[in-house]
Regions:
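Conserved short beta-strand edge segments in small beta-sheet-based binding/regulatory domains
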Residues: 43, 86-102
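Generic beta-strand structural signal
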Residues: 61-63, 96-97
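A common structural junction motif
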Residues: 33-34, 81-87
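Short S/T/G/P-rich N-terminal loop/turn motif that feeds into the first structured element of a domain
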Residues: 1-61, 67-78, 102-114
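Short, intrinsically disordered, mixed-charge
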Residues: 75-83, 91
């Protein structure tokens, strides 16, 4: 169950699918929008892209993002610069999933070790 505690850190997994004709635009959008994370105290833990030659039906990008609080995540979603990027680029993904993740007990991540 997702936490609603505004002061608790959250980690999110993002999986984005797109078509070959939108792929370059999707990458440019992600380059721009992910750069805003630091202004909200957040960071990209992992960003990966499908290898060339793989089935284009597979996700184009997968991200793991960390936010210091839910309030920071909400502020990122409402950031006027992010809204403008969405307007400028349009919908670049044909399908996307965002999953709030909990760390698995007994496994230390780089974030937890810091």
């Amino acid at each position: 169950m997702a936490t609603t505690d505004p002061d608790r850190p959250i980690s999110l997994a993002f999986v984005g699918h797109t078509t070959p004709d939108l792929a370059d635009r999707a990458v440019a959008y992600e380059d721009a929008v992910l750069a805003l994370l630091a202004d909200h105290g957040a960071r990209v833990v992992y960003r990966g892209r499908r290898r060339p030659g793989q089935d284009p039906a597979l996700p184009l990008e997968v991200h793991l993002l960390w936010f210091p609080t839910r309030t920071a995540f909400d502020a990122y979603l409402a950031d006027d610069r992010r809204v403008e990027l969405l307007r400028r680029f349009g919908e670049v993904f044909t399908s996307k999933q965002v999953v709030e993740m909990d760390a698995i007990s007994g496994v230390t991540t780089d974030i937890e070790a810091q």
